[in-house]
């Protein structure tokens, strides 16, 4: 199996950037505090322009959940120089595409265009950073849009509602407990003054990270950034201060019934450490732990035992994402076959994890997982948008450019012993929430 993975990885190599293209990453900071990162890739005359703000759903004022996502939508309205909707129309007219996104730690905006259109993208992005105009009609219309978006993505999904309740139970005080899109009753009360206050507090060059990836040079990017972003005044935004959870001393349980559920499942989530600047080994060990437990199909611990050997599970998995500003989540899941209760499915998870903690990691499986992870990292480098996104997420989560560049080497250096140490640290019920999602009568 290992040699086939090696052959597959080698087959990818002709399609990868050359070493110079893949590793030419530079950074600079303008006098107004704008941090810029340039990723050179000269294979095609295309550029990805991203502007990331160090503000997200976890930075919203109490009682105003959803405002970060709301503002993301409103940023496509009129400015002092553009009509409502003209931003995206201009990108499209120049043969490009654009979008935006919100998470707990960041809000981001991006455009993919021909490299000779980069200056125009900066001009428009700098304009809406400080010159957004909003009418009461804009607020009313877009609030209806995001409420409908919540209805479609969350309220109509039993799994999404269940996940909201799980996070709200897992985090006791930290704002990661609040949905990215906000609670419906708080979205309904958001007004124009709320939005403008948030906009003026956080949308400024000293709270932004510019990522440009593609057919550009650092000198070109700096000249354009100085021209378009340089004149903007900084706001003096303070470093983020968030409430943190007290010590967690008891496990919690969530039981949610919904008639729309067809496949009941049990999930247990644990508070877990994130990647820290200069200290990523624990997060790397947890990344590999999630892969050992569930990341390599039928050979991973949970699916191998529960799905293949015992046929007691339709699906068993683990998940972990360490790129957060604050403590993150490690989860294990089990969707039992019909006839196996959720109580039994939970016991199955506990049993398999306990056996794993006793037996340790199979060395051959661990070598395969590390190699597969490295191959996936190499493959991801083939798209400049993925590169830009990786740096944007990392930097807005508190990492440095060096941390992001070091990550593959950190992963490659992790030992099985470190993974087992991370497993023993994480699998303590005092920091966990166990949830059952089921339907009435099941």
Residue ranges and their predicted role:
Residues 267-271, 294-336:
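A structural supersecondary motif
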Residues 209-211, 333-335, 356, 360, ...:
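C-terminal regions of mature proteins
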Residues 172, 180, 205, 209-276, ...:
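An aromatic/glycine/proline-enriched structural segment found at the starts
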Residues 25, 49-112, 177-180, 296-312, ...:
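M16/MPP (pitrilysin/insulinase) zinc-metallopeptidase core fold and M16-derived inactive scaffolds
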Residues 22-52:
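Mature N-terminal segment immediately following signal peptide/propeptide cleavage
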Residues 5-17:
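Bacterial N-terminal signal peptides
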Residues 78, 121, 153-204, 225, ...:
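Scaffold signal of the M16-like zinc-metallopeptidase fold and its non-catalytic homologs
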Residues 78-81, 112-143, 296, 322-380:
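M16/insulysin-pitrilysin zinc metalloprotease superfamily fold
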């Amino acid at each position: 199996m290992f040699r086939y993975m090696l052959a597959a990885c080698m087959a990818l190599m002709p399609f990868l950037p050359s070493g110079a293209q893949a590793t030419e990453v530079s950074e600079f900071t303008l006098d107004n505090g704008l941090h810029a990162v340039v990723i050179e890739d000269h294979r095609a005359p295309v550029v990805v322009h991203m502007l990331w703000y160090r503000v997200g759903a976890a930075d919203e004022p109490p009682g105003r959940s959803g405002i970060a996502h709301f503002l993301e939508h409103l940023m496509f309205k009129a400015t002092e120089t553009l009509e409502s909707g003209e931003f995206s129309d201009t990108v499209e007219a120049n043969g490009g595409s654009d979008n935006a996104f919100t998470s707990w730690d960041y809000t981001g905006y991006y455009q993919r265009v021909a490299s000779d259109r980069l200056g125009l993208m900066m001009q428009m992005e700098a304009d809406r950073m400080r010159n957004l105009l909003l009418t009461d009609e804009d607020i009313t219309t877009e609030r209806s849009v995001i409420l409908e978006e919540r209805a479609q993505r969350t309220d109509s999904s039993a799994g999404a509602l269940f996940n909201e309740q799980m996070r709200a139970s897992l985090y006791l005080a930290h704002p990661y407990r609040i949905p990215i899109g906000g609670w419906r009753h708080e979205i309904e009360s958001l007004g124009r003054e709320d939005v403008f206050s948030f906009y003026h507090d956080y949308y400024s060059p000293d709270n932004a990270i510019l990522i440009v990836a593609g057919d550009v040079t650092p000198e070109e990017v700096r000249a354009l950034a100085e021209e378009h972003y340089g004149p903007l005044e900084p706001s003096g935004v303070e470093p983020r201060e968030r409430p943190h959870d007290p010590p967690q001393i008891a496990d919690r349980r969530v039981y949610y019934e919904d008639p729309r559920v067809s496949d009941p499942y049990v999930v247990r989530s644990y508070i877990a450490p994130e990647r820290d600047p200069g200290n990523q080994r624990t997060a790397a060990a947890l990344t590999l732990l999630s892969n050992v437990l569930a990341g390599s199909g039928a050979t991973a611990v949970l699916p191998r035992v529960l799905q293949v050997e015992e046929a007691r599970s339709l699906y068993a998995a683990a998940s972990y994402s360490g790129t957060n500003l604050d403590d993150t989540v490690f989860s294990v899941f089990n969707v039992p076959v019909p006839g196996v209760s959720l109580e039994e499915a939970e016991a199955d998870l506990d049993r398999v994890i306990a056996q794993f903690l006793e037996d340790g990691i199979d060395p051959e499986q661990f070598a395969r997982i590390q190699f597969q992870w490295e191959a996936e990292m190499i493959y991801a480098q083939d798209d400049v948008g993925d590169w830009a996104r990786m740096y944007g997420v990392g930097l807005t989560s508190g990492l440095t450019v060096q941390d992001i560049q070091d990550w593959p080497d950190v992963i490659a250096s992790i030992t099985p012993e470190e993974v087992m140490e991370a497993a023993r640290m994480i699998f303590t019920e005092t920091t966990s929430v166990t949830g059952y999602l089921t339907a009435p009568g099941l």
